Amino acid sequence: MSSDIPQVPRPLNRRLRAFAFDPILSRSIDMYEINEVTIELPWEETLQAGPVDDYIEVVDVDPASRAFYAPADLNHAYLLAQDGYPPSEGNPQFHQQMVYAVVRTTIGHFEQALGRRALWSPRLVLTGDGWEDVFVERLRVYPHALREANAYYSPAKKALLFGYFAASPAGGGLNLPGETVFACLSHDIVAHETTHALLDGLHRRFIEPSNVDVWALHEAFADIVALFQHFTYPEVLRDQIARTQGRLEDQNLLGELAYQFGQAIGRYGALRSALGAYDETGTWHRTQPDPQAIGRTSEPHARG
């Protein structure tokens, strides 16, 4: 009998835990089970602490706090054995894992649709011969870049920058007044901003506001990708279909974006919704089609 140890095959996927929506939903006894999902990503042999791979580089510097958080090493044996860090609002390494998992998931959906690898828009560099395109290997991701209620893609930095802020006392729902809300822990916000970067890589001129609809296209496309990503998690889909009895035109989480963020800045519900909105009394109403609305709207998010 041979005493040789059989070779262990390389895994196909890396499993990482993340929030399906926002951390706040895990406080609800009837929502916490579907709000924590396990994302499967293609196995990367060269993944470095950060995480850093062939597509993105997570850099966790916090300028407002003058802090730099230790990079997550997702190759640690203990983390591999338990699908990464458990979801946590207070652990910076989970924040790094969360943005990495959602950014890579969004990239994967783009590549599946396009049938090719995704590329970032090149960096324009002024040389003695004029402006030249310089290849951008990795998109940088900063989970704690801003101490404000904001998140955005920077075409100049080729980076995603996420903020954190204190929840408004006027906000409702499960937020506590003054608690810290992290944009990097919102699945919707991360997917939305990643889409801006991917769309810029597909067509760099779409980042230039040559007319009122260019930025609106960016915002609409990013919202649609974030919304459709909800439908890729079977447990979430089953739950919301059951709660609405199949009437997905009624209020449900599948049609809403950035639920916690919206409440934290003082709104009754999500930051944006594809289905309806709350009035001044806090009552939700389904949005009625209005062909004239586009003529009254110029702000990119609302127009998109």
Regions found by a protein language model. Name each.
Residues 1-104, 108-112, 120-123, 134-137, ...:
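Acidic/polar low-complexity interaction segments
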Residues 194:
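Glycine-rich, mobile lid/loop segments that gate access to catalytic sites or pores
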Residues 103, 107-121, 128-159, 163-191, ...:
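Zinc-dependent metallohydrolase catalytic domains
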